[in-house]
């Protein structure tokens, strides 16, 4: 079965909210070695249904990147109640991956739901540990910068990225997006003790875009560059002008926004990263 289409009359489209620790896995997208989140989820679906099921996700996360709420859909002719999908699939998943909720979406002749293409916007968190000494307890869960960072300067710099822009300067050379033009809705930067949280909300993101933005904001925060530098980087529209891609450890896919008509049982953006 193909998660990309729902043409069969008897087919049902099921949507899952999936949370995972990305540290043990080589990203979302399936690979020959099978060490990805998609591979493990589809294996669990097979064990539960005894059918081969192909999934489609809202955003393909890289190796080491986590998800508070990845959204996934697939098609099936099987009839199961939603809690059965949650409990049954979780039985066969490793401890670092869990289905948090399941929902069936109604057939819409004008537009079938698609986890990726039906999304209106996305939100990512980046959690950064800012302390002279690294924390073993945050290994794989947060980025680390040992030099003191100025939050106010980073906030000033981030304001230059708001609105619709060509984000080529923050785009990976491997990026396959058709257009580098995206709309940045908000960038929020907060500090609690030694933890700094970047919350980035846009209509869509380019490959490595969040990590490249965070890396560039760190250059501003540690005094390497002035806040106005980020405006120049954006205008330059070339990857060479921005800072190097920052580590994946602290990046979390937090929320995918959809039209309320789909009635997905999504949670609000979770704050447990602060706890």
From Swiss-Prot:
InterPro entries associated with the record: PsdUridine_synth_cat_dom_sf (IPR020103), PsdUridine_synth_TruA (IPR001406), PsdUridine_synth_TruA_a/b_dom (IPR020097), PsdUridine_synth_TruA_C (IPR020095), TruA/RsuA/RluB/E/F_N (IPR020094)
GO biological process assignments: tRNA pseudouridine synthesis
Listed SUPFAM superfamilies: Pseudouridine synthase
Example of a GO MF term: tRNA pseudouridine(38-40) synthase activity
Active site annotation, chain numbering: 62
Superkingdom of origin: Bacteria
Signal sequence interval, chain numbering: none
Annotated protein name in UniProt: tRNA pseudouridine synthase A
Encoding gene (name): truA
